[in-house]
């Protein structure tokens, strides 16, 4: 196996990730690349605000590789920036997870990064990774035009989205991270805000169906919430979206054990749960302000259309 050559590389690091530890990790990464010559030339830029990583990735012309150093949020921004570039010149993506979720990194096989050992970068290979495209409409914007956003791992609507979005404030209060944080947020959301979400759904152009969903997850990778295996068989390189949704009305007493069983992917055979695969999905929401998340970031919409862009992004993946 040949040693990895990232070529000219841009490192985009969120210095606030992992309670500020990511800044030190970025400096160690610089020294590692310098000593091992894994990149012919590299530049390090620290993000300064929300959306900055997207801007930097969009402007990363002339680079072969962009390394996203941070959690799922900074990776999501970097992916959205890279997807604005023409495919012929679009840099490849590498990730070093320094966050609280890290589902995308786990899908790539990077699940034990400590911030000190960069061994995952020593022997990597390029693979073509699917990307999800979201077209969303928000009447409050007044434009009537769709907003386009991309995601690399997870899109969901309903109680699971509320759980994911609720982890931000809960992390500040508790200091928890990863699956324990997501589980605690789940117990909180089920206790305070549990409900069914009426919506109309259509997959691959089939006739629309009205459902009362408690969750609607449209996945590229198998997990969300730091390891919850919501779509256990999802493959981010197969050109297909994997969908898990639970239709109600589902009583809270049934839904909570179902949520907990999803940690190990044991929910898929339960009666309220439906599993399917598609390339295109359309969701129209009957009420405003449904919780919607893409890679843990909020989406505001009354209607969304989702497509899979097969093999749209080259991604460096550690070889086993």
Task: Please place each PLM-identified region on the residue numbering.
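Short glycine-rich anion-binding loops that position phosphate/pyrophosphate groups of nucleotides
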Residues: 16-17, 71-74, 98-101, 157, ...
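Short glycine/serine/threonine-rich phosphate/pyrophosphate-binding segments
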Residues: 53, 73-78, 103-104, 129
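ATP/nucleoside-binding phosphotransfer catalytic cores, i.e., glycine-rich phosphate-binding loops
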Residues: 203-210, 229-320
């Amino acid at each position: 196996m040949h040693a990895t050559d990232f070529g000219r590389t841009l490192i985009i690091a969120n210095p606030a990730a992992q309670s500020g530890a990511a800044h030190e990790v970025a400096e160690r990464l610089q020294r590692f690349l310098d000593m091992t010559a894994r990149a012919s030339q590299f530049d390090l830029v620290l993000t300064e605000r929300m959306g900055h990583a997207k801007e930097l990735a969009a402007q990363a012309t002339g680079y072969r590789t962009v390394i996203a150093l941070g959690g799922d949020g900074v990776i999501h921004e970097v992916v959205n920036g890279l997807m604005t570039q023409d495919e012929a010149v679009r840099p490849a993506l590498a990730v070093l997870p320094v966050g609280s979720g890290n589902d995308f990194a786990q899908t790539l096989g990077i699940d034990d990064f400590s911030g000190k050992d960069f061994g995952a970068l020593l022997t990597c290979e390029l693979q073509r990774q699917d990307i999800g495209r979201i077209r969303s409409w928000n009447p409050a914007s007044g434009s009537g035009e769709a907003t386009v956003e991309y995601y690399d791992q997870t899109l969901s609507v309903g109680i699971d989205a509320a759980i994911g979005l609720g982890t931000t404030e809960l992390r500040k209060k508790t200091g928890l991270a990863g699956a324990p944080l997501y589980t605690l947020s789940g117990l909180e959301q089920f206790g305070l805000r549990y409900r069914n979400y009426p919506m109309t759904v259509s997959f691959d152009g089939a006739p629309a169906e009205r459902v009362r969903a408690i969750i609607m997850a449209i996945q590229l990778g198998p997990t969300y919430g730091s390891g919850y295996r919501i779509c256990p068989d999802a493959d981010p390189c197969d050109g297909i979206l994997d969908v898990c949704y639970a239709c109600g009305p589902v009583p809270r007493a049934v839904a909570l054990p179902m949520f907990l069983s999803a940690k190990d992917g044991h929910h898929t055979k339960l009666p309220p749960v439906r599993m399917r695969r598609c390339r295109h999905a359309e969701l129209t929401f009957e009420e405003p302000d449904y919780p919607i998340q893409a890679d843990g970031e909020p989406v505001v919409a009354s209607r969304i259309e989702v497509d899979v862009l097969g093999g749209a992004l080259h991604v460096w993946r550690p070889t086993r």
